[in-house]
Regions:
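The feature captures the catalytic groove of carbohydrate-active enzymes
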Residues: 253, 323, 327-342, 394-445, ...
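Sec-dependent N-terminal signal peptides
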Residues: 4-13
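Solvent-exposed beta-hairpin/edge-strand motifs
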Residues: 716-731
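Acidic/polar, glycine-enriched structural segments that form the non-catalytic walls/loops
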Residues: 20-341, 361-365, 371-382, 549, ...
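Carbohydrate-binding surface patches
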Residues: 149-158, 688-714
Length: 761
């Protein structure tokens, strides 16, 4: 049943997206203007050592949500490293823990037999999701590589401008950065087939991955030349293209590389089939790009915003067999940092923060499936494993779910808790957002509410009810940060607050659990406040800030005490002005005075910039600090710090939040944008509204709202104190209510509405 309604939800999104993309001229003009900035260029060969990474990709990369590729070159060759997201070994041990670990699969190397010459050029083309190379050889060869969507074909199209045929060698190999895993190689009817196998002793499961390669368009020979390598040779003719087609198969936990199935598919491969695969890929990416976009007026900011969309859509989508970790589908070393895991104390959630407002919510589907897969083990741990969190919890047993920090998408935890209990509740915002941004009640009923209730069950049992003054309060003692042990850290209180707010809201919508609401309300009323202190580190502005726990812990890095702003959203632009000002003070103290926004390793991934936008923090500072980080991006346009990857896409949510926020179900246009022109197209807001607007630096010049579900649409008057009208797509004025600068009207699904300054005519 779950798969059935998930299919319906995704189908509805796809239909909506198709309708949304019918602005061909405007969209086409926008993307053509961005083609250059979304093309990364190398004009010299780059070696394996230059792109070798145990974290984010350092070279040209592409992905389809299941397969990842990273390239390196010589003047006459290209090697495409290949990984598969569900190729995971058991039994790997390092400082981070023992258990599951993601591995690379192998690669495909294409070499040109021609002396060195001028003209080497390599281009990673994000808009078309392909990587193009011209060899630096006297007989130049053009290689265009791409991945199919939903089917794991890696295709390289070869052509030459040489007047004579050019000899080509293709090597398909299995392996990674070590030789400790099993591998095989064979040929069958000139199809190369290699496999790699995970550890086989003292393990819970075994996985195999296969790479099978066929040459289309040229007579060829295939020979096994090593225990993990098959070599094809052929002549590339100037008259026609030749295709190197590799099908990646296997993965999972059933010790099966699925070579017979791969062989069967490649025996049928043809140039016509390849064209169809390319067309399917091009359509998918065109739709993905057209979902939404922004114009910030700053080429550096625009570049990282849009390249982040490319990174997200390459790493995760509805075709992913399992959810990738912090490094998406690019696990290209046998010793990936943190096992290439899903880090549950913010890192991996941060990779999905932007997909909702960016109108690509289905990209989060693999993550939901992973979390649901972990619930049974999480329930066992809450009952039986509390002492592993902290010795003081020995003998304690809770309902609900308890997650450690680390897991792999195949459905296995590994490693310690680092004394934290927020790793399951950290997913509450993500589950709520899919419903809030799409209006999908099936998702709310069958997926979001059950998970959020598990977190509520845990908190009901874990919180301590204690006397406080003339009343009582519900306190929490937990690790607010990794390996700390804190009384009432705001980082965790915000998740408690959000969890019970959502349970009250959603239980009313679904008409369930009425008998539990009194307890939930009581907890909300009696939660401790956030500790306020004067800064203890210099320099500072001498203004009050939020501490990290009730004892007044002041560590100027990682603004975890502002989870209330984001991702929990229990503090917003409508909150008490004094509380909001203290939040801004905290951001300035940690982020500017103490240089945290750019000097701390991952404040971007930690959503500090989103927190700034949600608090109304100085937008010029936010933009300047983001640009400082973006300016340090690599040639492949990724910001890297040796540890993180996907969460750097929080630039997208930061910019979106500066341009559009849903504040207590009211749309605010450009709530934290500086006095300079900007625009956004089809950003998704809570309530299922797709919003487009243009700002000239002084006032909003246009606003269009499309309803994907029926309901009341509320927006803050963009022209405060002036009359407003709303017209539908036929120009008919709709009934509008206005109260204290908040305008509202009833929107119908599938209809668009223009918000206009009323001329009085």
């Amino acid at each position: 049943m779950k798969r059935y309604f998930l299919f319906l939800s995704l189908s509805a999104l796809a239909a909506t997206a198709f309708a949304e993309s019918r602005l061909p001229e405007a969209d086409k003009a926008f993307w053509e203007s961005k083609r250059g900035m979304l093309t990364a260029v190398w004009q010299q060969p780059f070696s394996y050592e230059s792109i070798r990474s145990k974290h984010a990709p350092l070279g040209p990369y592409m992905g389809n949500g299941d397969i990842g590729c990273v390239a390196y070159t010589a003047y006459n060759s290209q090697t495409l490293l290949v990984s598969k997201v569900d190729f995971v070994t058991d039994g790997w041990s390092d400082w981070a823990g023992s258990g599951a670990a993601a591995l690379p699969a192998g690669g495909v190397r294409i070499s040109v037999d021609s002396p060195e010459g001028p003209g080497f050029d390599y281009r990673m083309k994000m808009l078309s999701n392909k990587m193009d190379m011209t060899t630096g050889t006297q007989n130049p060869v053009q290689m265009s590589s791409w991945l199919s969507v939903g089917k794991n074909y890696l295709v390289t199209e070869l052509s030459t401008t040489s007047r004579e045929p050019v000899r080509i060698t293709v090597e398909t190999y299995a392996g990674g950065s070590t030789g400790i895993y099993g591998k095989t190689a064979k040929t069958q009817s000139r199809i190369a087939q290699v496999t790699r196998r995970t550890k086989t002793e003292d393990v819970e499961w075994i996985s195999q991955v296969g790479l099978s390669t066929a040459i289309v368009g040229a007579e060829n020979e295939a020979n096994v030349v090593a225990d993990s390598l098959v070599r094809h040779t052929f002549w590339l003719s100037p008259e026609a293209k030749t295709y190197v087609v590799t099908l990646v198969s296997g993965g999972g936990m059933d010790d099966n590389a699925r070579l017979p199935e791969a062989y069967s598919q490649l025996k049928k491969i043809s140039e016509k089939r390849i064209r169809k695969l390319r067309q399917e890929k091009d359509r998918w990416w065109q739709d993905m790009w057209n979902r939404s976009y922004v114009e910030t007026g700053d080429s550096l900011l625009d570049r990282h915003y849009l390249s982040s969309i490319y990174l997200l859509a390459s790493a995760y989508n509805e075709h992913s067999p399992v959810c990738g970790g912090m490094y998406g589908v690019w696990n290209m070393d046998d010793q990936m940092n943190y096992h290439g895991d899903i880090h549950l104390n913010y890192n991996s959630q941060g990779g999905f923060y932007s997909v909702f407002s960016a109108n690509r919510p289905e990209l989060a589907m693999p993550f939901y499936e992973f979390i649901e897969k972990m619930v049974p083990e999480g329930k066992r741990r809450a009952r039986e494993d509390m002492a592993s969190v902290h010795p003081s919890l020995k003998g304690k047993s809770c309902r609900g779910v308890l997650f450690p920090v680390s897991a792999l998408g195949i459905g296995r935890f590994y490693g310690p808790y680092w004394q934290q209990t927020m790793d399951a509740p950290f997913n509450v915002p993500l589950f709520s957002w899919y419903y809030e941004y799409t209006g999908d009640r099936d998702f709310l009923k069958n997926r979001a509410y059950p998970f959020i209730r598990e977190c509520g069950d845990f908190y009901e049992d874990y919180l301590t009810k204690e006397l406080w003054g003339n009343s009582y309060r519900y306190s929490i003692i937990t690790g607010g940060h990794e390996n700390s042990w804190d009384l009432n850290p705001p980082s965790d209180l915000a998740f408690v607050d959000l969890t019970f707010r959502l349970l009250l809201k959603y239980s009313n919508i679904l008409d369930v659990d009425a008998d539990r609401r009194a307890k939930w309300q009581d907890i909300l009323i009696h939660l401790p406040g956030y500790k306020v202190i004067m800064p203890t580190k210099t320099p500072n502005e001498g203004l009050p800030v939020y501490a990290k726990n009730e004892d007044g812990w002041d560590a100027p890095s990682h603004m975890i005490q502002l989870h209330a702003l984001y991702p929990c959203e229990v503090m917003n632009l409508n909150s008490d002005p004094d509380s909001l000002q203290i939040a801004r003070n905290t951001i300035y103290y940690y982020g500017v005075s103490q240089n945290g926004l750019t000097g701390t390793m991952n404040e971007l991934g930690l959503s500090a910039f989103v927190m700034g936008a949600r608090s109304g923090f100085d937008p010029n500072i936010l933009i300047d600090k983001m640009k400082y980080l973006i300016a340090g991006a690599g040639k492949n346009l990724l910001i890297t710090d040796g540890h993180h990857c996907l969460e750097k896409t929080a630039v997208v949510e930061t910019v979106n939040s500066m341009m559009l926020q849903s504040v207590d179900d009211v749309l605010w246009l450009f709530p934290d944008w500086p006095a300079r022109p900007a625009s956004f197209t089809r950003l998704r807001a809570k309530g299922g509204f797709l919003v487009s607007a243009r700002y000239d630096g002084t006032q909003v010049k246009s606003c269009q709202i499309q309803a994907t579900v029926s309901g009341r649409c509320q927006f803050r008057n963009p022209w405060k104190g002036q009359p407003v009208r709303v017209c539908d797509e036929r120009g008919r004025e709709v009934a509008l209510s206005v109260e204290k600068n908040i305008c509202s009207f009833m929107a119908k699904a599938g209809h668009s509405y223009m918000v206009q300054l009323h001329s009085g005519e």
